[in-house]
Amino acid sequence: MESWTWMTVVVLLGLTVRWTVSLNSYSGAGKPPMFGDYEAQRHWQEITLNLPVKQWYFNSSDNNLQYWGLDYPPLTAYHSLLCAYVAKFINPDWVALHTSRGYESQAHKLFMRTTVLAADLLIYIPAVLLYCYSLKEISPKRKIASALCILLYPGLILIDYGHFQYNSVSLGFALWGVLGVSCDWDLLGSLAFCLALNYKQMELYHSLPFFCFLLGKCFKKGLRGKGSALFIRIACTVVASFLLCWLPFLTEREHALQVVRRLFPVDRGLFEDKVANIWCSLNVFLKIKDILPRHIQIAISFCFTFLSLLPACIKLTVQPSAKGFRFTLVSCALSFFLFSFQVHEKSILLVSLPVCLVLTEIPFMSTWFLLVSTFSMLPLLLKDQLLLPSVVTVMAFLIACSTFFPMFENTSEEQLQLKSFAVSVRRHLPGFTFLPRIIQCLFLSSVITMILLTILSVTLDPPQKLPDLFSVLICFVSCVNFVFFLVYFNIVIMWDSKNGRNRKKID
């Protein structure tokens, strides 16, 4: 069969899994008065359709910001408005001001699920296919396998089609941006990433690698020649993109500031709910939120985030390469997730996207990370009654990855991209030849722990005095895994001596 035929089969399989998951429950189903993210997305459609633009982000009698107030950038609001027009055409009751609050029906659920699928088909899935086809030095079969594994990644499917969100939009735009700048379509790549950033502010997790990669390109071209011209063109593209997205909100200074305040609610504290990052895990032993003033918490969070991502960003600026860019995206996004302020459990998807992009380069570690990332959201998925689809999609993903990228056949020092690091260590410890075995043991320990915690969470009730015991354990175990991955990816980046050979010549 032609590769395009196989790719069509892959897409159809991915769509089938997505739609099957969408038949299950969603966030806040039948749980008044606040319901959940499903109601939040519906409510934003109600607000954007019935209120003028200037009232979208302000508290009023018609727009109670305490009830799922709009807190995403303008592009999300425009998307909500577009969906609202379609909803009003089908059934005005779905988006009627005030009276539609908490609206639930099978017809409305079908509509909402369809809007997610449409966004996926228009933005995310085409980007995945084009990215896989653009991969160099791998066979067509491996490109198809890569597309299959990426489209079967359970974390994104369960959150968008189960819990209910539109993460595929921002992640899709970000992937188009990665494609653009990796193929030297720098202006298109910059535009795509600006769209991602104006859809979800959490795309800031990816912003520094984009900036450093493009800046490094400008340096390589020479700031006195083509480099300065490229820098100016990119800057103009970014400014123009933001102006177009924010234009309705720039008529008054207070209006723009209110949008910014809604996007970055520092008053909420270091973290919300149970999230697998450093601050939530540390909170088990040391109540940082109670001990330190909020401005000190923000300062500490900023310092740790900045210091953890600085080495990779410096190397990417000095040695810009498509490979280095992909790995730095992983490292920086993971640094933000572990150390930054106001992290949500679903933000791990921002790390998972670039990990999917290096799946063909380090299949063992990528598959392991993607499994842990899905496991880290288990408390949320159980809350939404998504246990069965979680187990099935994880198994399907694991089978696909194990079939096309055999797990333990990809754990040599070369395949883990740790050869340079191991050689450096052996200069001081000649007997250091067991690194692959260590990695395999850590993987098995991680998987066994995840399976045990999943079984315990489902079969046992936590002690009355410790109602969040299993959720905290899941977050803590996931955090330990993520710290290990952060160290691993930084080692790969800093000890990579192949950038010069892998880097395309920048004229």
Curated annotation (Swiss-Prot):
GO biological process: dolichol-linked oligosaccharide biosynthetic process; protein N-linked glycosylation
UniProt pathway: Protein modification; protein glycosylation
Residues annotated as glycosylated: N59
Enzyme class, broadest EC rank: transferase
Lumenal side: 24-114, 165-172, 251-297, 354-361, 407-437, 490-507
UniProt keyword annotation of Nucleus present: no
Membrane topology value: Multi-pass membrane protein
Keyword annotations of the record: Endoplasmic reticulum, Glycoprotein, Glycosyltransferase, Membrane, Transferase, Transmembrane, Transmembrane helix
Subcellular location: Endoplasmic reticulum membrane
Protein name: Dolichyl pyrophosphate Man9GlcNAc2 alpha-1,3-glucosyltransferase
Taxonomic source organism: Rattus norvegicus (Rat)
